[in-house]
Amino acid sequence: MADTSMYQGSLTALVTPMHTDGRIDFDVSAKLIERQIEAGTTALIPAGTTGESPTLSHEEHGRVVAHCVETANGRVRVMAGAGSNSTSEAVLMAKHAHSVGADSVLVVVPYYNKPTQEGLYRHFMTIADATPLPMFLYCIPGRSVVDISVATMARLAEHPNIVGTKDATANMARPIAVRRAVDKPFNQLSGDDNSVLSFLAAGGDGCIGVTSNVVPHLCADMHLAWQEGRIEDAIAIQDHLTPLHDAMFMESNPGPVKYALSRLGLCNATLRLPLVEPQEETRRAIDAALRSLELLD
């Protein structure tokens, strides 16, 4: 039986490692997934923003999700990226995720075409109707421009398959407002590494992080400390991580995180255009953050 309990703790939005010619490196991907599981990451999110989904072909997107499910092999859950600004494309992605055994799907707010709240409602309801998988709404107005209002989220939550949200707004009033508006247990996950402790304090359940690609053990430890009531320990870990959190978003994700992984010898820094490797100032900041964590000499 599928695990339908709430996601908690440190979840990782996985990078998609690539060879220098831009082909996906599935061997390295498997090693990164093993590293995540061994470090205590509670779930994996392939083929999202951090996984460069906008520049993956449909075939590649499907292979990345299937590869993650196969490699995880039930040890942790897989929440597959299934977002598109085309409802029909998102439906196909969600159906594929279900067909290969993903545990849930993460569907971003449609970007660029700027739908109204009614358009957002119909978009997400159509996807939720198309598959039995639990679905998470991904709110990231910095990339999508539009956002789901709390009222629309409450309407969407009436669908039994819509079970939670990834909230990258960094608005700490939002998880409280959503909790009060939604008339069922609703799984709220932060999508902002820097503000995760504030999000947890506001009643959130966990974080889908980027930094956890680099230091999955520290991110998992921070969440465990919080869950066990060791608040001072959680704060200390988060303070220690803050320079790396900051550096990860000095330029467009996933440029910085891939560079950081390359510095640790875990994958190369190859990105697909229009994304490019970080500039020198960003590279210096990442190196300094890694040294502060004693990960570089």
Swiss-Prot record:
Disulfide bonds: none annotated. Gene3D superfamilies: Aldolase class I. The active site is at Y138 (proton donor/acceptor), K166 (schiff-base intermediate with substrate). It catalyses: L-aspartate 4-semialdehyde + pyruvate = (2S,4S)-4-hydroxy-2,3,4,5-tetrahydrodipicolinate + H2O + H(+). It holds the Pfam family DHDPS. Pyruvate binds at T50, I208. GO terms for biological process: diaminopimelate biosynthetic process; lysine biosynthetic process via diaminopimelate. The keyword Signal does not apply. Pathway: Amino-acid biosynthesis; L-lysine biosynthesis via DAP pathway; (S)-tetrahydrodipicolinate from L-aspartate: step 3/4. The record marks T49, Y112 as: Part of a proton relay during catalysis. One of its GO terms (molecular function) is 4-hydroxy-tetrahydrodipicolinate synthase activity. PROSITE patterns: DHDPS_1 (PS00665). Its EC number is 4.3.3.7. Signal peptide: none annotated. Keywords: Amino-acid biosynthesis, Cytoplasm, Diaminopimelate biosynthesis, Lyase, Lysine biosynthesis, Schiff base. Belongs to the DapA family. HAMAP family: DapA. Catalyzes the condensation of (S)-aspartate-beta-semialdehyde [(S)-ASA] and pyruvate to 4-hydroxy-tetrahydrodipicolinate (HTPA). This is 4-hydroxy-tetrahydrodipicolinate synthase.
